Amino acid sequence: MRRKTLEIYSVELDGTKDTKQLGQEEGKKCNELDLKKSSQKEELKKELDLDDHKLTSEELEQKYGTNIIRGLSSTRAAELLARDGPNALSPPKQTPEIIKFLKQMIGGFSILLWVGAILCWIAYGIQYASNQSGSLDNVYLGVVLALVVILTGIFAYYQEAKSTNIMSSFSKMIPQEALVTRDAEKKVIPAEQLVVGDIVEIKGGDQIPADIRLLFSQGCKVDNSSLTGESEPQPRSAEFTHENPLETKNIAFYSTTCLEGTATGMVINTGDRTIIGRIASLASGVGNEKTPIATEIEHFVHIVAGVAVSIGILFFIIAVSLKYRVLDSIIFLIGIIVANVPEGLLATVTVTLSLTAKRMAKKNCLVKNLEAVETLGSTSVICSDKTGTLTQNRMTVAHLWFDSQIFTADTSESQSNQAFDQSSGTWASLSKIIALCNRAEFRPGQENVPIMKRVVVGDASETALLKFSEVILGDVMEIRKRNRKVAEIPFNSTNKFQLSIHETEDPGDPRFLMVMKGAPERILEKCSTIMINGQEQPLDKNNANAFHTAYMELGGMGERVLGFCHLYLPAHEFPENYSFDVDTMNFPTSNLCFVGLLSMIDPPRSTVPDAVAKCRSAGIKVIMVTGDHPITAKAIAKSVGIISANSETVEDIAKRCNIAVEQVNKQDARAAVVTGMELKDMTPEQLDEILANYPEIVFARTSPQQKLIIVEGCQRQNAVVAVTGDGVNDSPALKKADIGIAMGIAGSDAAKNAADMVLLDDNFASIVTGVEEGRLIFDNLKKTIAYTLTKNIAELCPFLVYIIVGLPLPIGTITILFIDLGTDIIPSIALAYEKVESDIMNRKPRHKKKDRLVNHQLAIYSYLHIGLMQALGAFLVYFTVYAQQGFWPTSLIQLRVKWEQDYVNDLEDSYGQQWTRYQRKYLEWTGYTAFFVGIMVQQIADLIIRKTRRNSIFQQGLFRNKVIWVGITSQIIVALILSCGLGSITALNFTMLRVQYWFVAVPHAILIWVYDEVRKLFLRLYPGSWWDKNMYY
C-alpha cells in the first residue's frame, strides 16, 4: 500500500523517474559542474512520502502528538517551531546587486569593447614608455569605449532591476494570520508561527495558511486553479476520496483560497515542505538558458574578434618583416584590432531592442527582458496553459437540452446573441429554475456595469448561471423577490443536489414551487415525469434513453453538466403557513418533474482560434499543457484548433474502428492527448518520440514538475520554447522556457516575475503580434549589423596601407570614433523601423544553429563587396585632397617616416613646395576629414540598400520608413558640424573642408546602390540557385 501511495502521488507531483534517466543520459556529456546542477534540480523534483489523507483522526493525533479538541500545547508548539522553523518560504541565495551590475558590464559586445579600450591604453603606454611624442588619441578612444560600455550596462541593468524577485511574489500569497486552537483555547496567531499538528479553522474568503488535513467541513469549497489549473471550485470534506493527495477532498493546500463554507483541519506541512513551497523552490532553482539573441551576439563577437585578431597578427608579422620596430608593430597590431571593433553596435542593438519592446508594449506585450523581444520571433514551440490563457477563465453556459433537443448557447464574451428557441413552455420552466435555484448574487451598486463584467458573490458555476439568466430574463433579483425563497438545502458533495422552495408570483396559485439542480443522474433518480413542450409526460424508457444520450454527448465535449427539475407542492398538504424543516426534510424529494439539462464550460477566447491558425502557418507548434481533465482539455484544444478538425488520436481511431487501442497503428494518428499518469511512466526517449511524431499534442492532468519536464523535452528537440501561463503552477516552466509569457490581468505575481514577457490583455492572440515583431527585429538587426560592418573595412584599410605602403595616415582613431558613435548611430537605429519585405508569418521559425544573425554570406558581402568599394571611394577623396595640395599619389608612397618626423620642416611636395611639420599635420587632419566625409557619403547609399535584403528598394518604397531619412539628415548635419563648425578645434583632428570634396565619393555611392540592386535582381530571378545561396544574407 505504501508503494502504491508514492507511485500514484508522483503522477501529479513529479517525474523523478524521467529526470533520473535524463540525468544519466546527459551525465555522459556534462562536466562535474553540470552534474552538480542536475543533482540539485533532481533534489527539487524528488517524491514526497505523504499518506496523511488516508489516516484516521486517531492516527493523525498519534503521528503529530496533538489533540483534535485541545490542539497542541504552547510548549510543544514552541519546540516544533524551533525544530522546523517558521511557516514561511525560504528565499533563495540572492545574487548581490554589484555582481548583477558587473555581469552587464562584461557580457556580449561589452567584453569586446573593454578589450578595445584596454588595448588603446596599452598602445598609449607603449608610446609613452618609448619616449615617443604620441598623441592622446588612444587615451580618448579608450575612455570613450569604456563610457559606451558603462552607460549601456547601466541601461541594461536598470531594465533587469525592474523585475521583482520570484520569491517575494510567493510571499505575498501567504496569509498573515491564522485561527488556531492551542491549550484548548482558540487564538489568532501570525501564520508564520504555525507548526505541524496545529488545529486551525478556516472560513470563506480565507487563504489556507498551510497544507492542512481536514477533520470537519461544512460546505467548504476551495479555489485550486493557481495550483492545478482547474477552473471549477473544488469541494472539500473530511472524507478520504482518492489515493492521490492532490486529488483527495480531505487536504487543503497552502496559499489556495477557501471560497465558501467552513472547515477545521490539522497542519501537516509548513513552509518549504508544502506543495507551494516545493513549486517555489523549483521555480527559483531553475536556471535560465541563454537567449537565442545572446547566443547570436556571442557568435558575432567571436567572428569580429577572430577577424580582428587574424588581420592584426598578419600585419604585425608584415610590419616586423618590413623592419618596423617591434614596439611600433605592436601599436599597429592594436590599432588594427581596435579599428575592427564596432564601437556603436552595442548601443545600437540595445536601443533597437528597447524600441521594439516599446512598440510591443503598445500592442499589449510587456517585455521585461530586452533579449526576449527576438526570442519570441525564434519560437518554434508554444506550450500554452489552458485556463485563462486559451480560455476566458470564467464558466459559461454552453449548451442546453430540453424538449429532447440540444441547443447551443452563445459563449462569446458578451453572450448577447442567444439564438435558441425560447418560446417553449419547457424553457419558461427551466429558466425559472435556473434563476431561483441559485445562491449567487450581484454585488450592489453595479446597475450601470455591463452584465458580463459585474462582480458576483458566489462560485464560478453559480456565477455563470446568474449572468446567463440576467442576460436572457432580465432582472434576476426582481424575479427572486417575486418568488420569495422559504427554504433551502445548499449543494453538498454527499447529496450532489441543491434544492430551494419558493412562493410563486401567481396570485391565483397558492402552491409552493420546489426547484432542484445537481448531478444529472441524481436529479433523474428523483423524477417520475419529464416536461416536453411545456407538458408533463411519464418518464418512460425512451425519454430516459434520450436523456442519457444527451448527457453523454455534452459530457463528451468536456462540459460540466447539471440537471434541473421542479415540483409544485399540493396546496392542501403544504398550506401558506406551512413550516418547512430542511433537517427532517418534511417535504417530498421524489416524483419530481425533470425539465432539462444545462452544460457549462470555460470557453475559448474568440481570438484564439485565429491566433493558433497563424502560429500553424508560421511553423510554430502549439502544445496545450494543463492540469485540467483530459476530456475538457481535448474539447478546448479542438475548439481552438490545437487539434485540427480532421485529426484523430489513437483513442479516436480505436473508437471509430471499434478495436482495442493497442491494435491501432500509432503512425495513423496526428494528435495525442497525454495524461500526467502516462507521462509519469514515460522515459525521456518515449516523451521525445511523442514530441517528434505528433504535430498536435495536449498534455492534461499535469503537475508543475511535469510541465517543466515537457519544456525540457521540447528543448531536447532543439526547439525554441515559449511557455504561457498565469498560475503559480506555471512559474517553474515559465522560468525554464526560452521565453516565459505570463498573463497580466489574471496572472499571479509569481508567474509574472518568472516570465520574460507579460500579456497585458491576457490574450493568446497578442503572442502572434509578438512573434511577428520578434521575427522582424531579427531581420532588421541583420540589416543593422551589415550596415555597421561595411564601414569597418573602410576604417581598417587606412591602417593597412599606412603600414605596408607607408602613406601618411588617412584617418585617425578619433575620426573613426565620430563615425561609429556620431554619424552612424541614428541611421543604425532607423533600420529598426523598417517594415517587413514579405509575409514573415508564412515562413518557418529560424533554426537556431543554421540561421545565424551573422552568417558568412553577410560577413563576406559586407566586408569584401560593399566594404572594399567604400574603402576605394574614401581613398579617392583622400588622394584628391592631397593631390590638390601638391602631393600626387605616387609621391605619398613610403613618405610616412619623413612625414612624421618633427624636426623636418622642409618636406617637398610634387611641385617642389616645402612643408613644415605643422602644415603637414594640418593637411593630415584635412585628409582625416576628407576620408570621414567619403565614408559618410557612401554610408548614405549603404543605409538605403540595407532597407531590403531581397526586394528592390523601389518595391519596398523609398519613403515608407521616414526614420531612415531622419538618420540620413542626422549624418549630414553631424558631418557638417565637424567639418565646418568644429573644424577649427585641433583636438578633434578635423579641419574646414571645401565643398567640392563632399561630392568626390558620390559616384562610388551610386555604384554601391546599382551593384546591390543587381544582386537583389538576380536573387529574385534565380531563387535557390548558387547566387541565392551565396549572395543572400
Curated annotation (Swiss-Prot):
Residues 118-140, 318-329, 802-811, 876-927, 981-995 are lumenal. The keyword Plastid does not apply. The keyword Mitochondrion does not apply. Residues 1-96, 162-297, 348-781, 833-852, 948-961, 1017-1033 are cytoplasmic. The active site is at residue 385. It is an enzyme of class 7 (translocase). Gene3D superfamilies: Calcium-transporting ATPase, cytoplasmic domain N, Calcium-transporting ATPase, cytoplasmic transduction domain A, Calcium-transporting ATPase, transmembrane domain, HAD superfamily/HAD-like. GO terms for cellular component: plasma membrane. It is a multi-pass membrane protein. The modification Phosphoserine is found at residue 952. The chain crosses the membrane at residues 97-117, 141-161, 298-317, 330-347, 782-801, 812-832, 853-875, 928-947, 962-980, 996-1016. Its EC number is 7.2.2.19. Disulfide bonds: none annotated. Found in skin, kidney and distal colon. Mg(2+) binds at residues 726, 730. Belongs to the cation transport ATPase (P-type) (TC 3.A.3) family. Type IIC subfamily. This is Potassium-transporting ATPase alpha chain 2. It comes from Cavia porcellus. The gene is ATP12A.
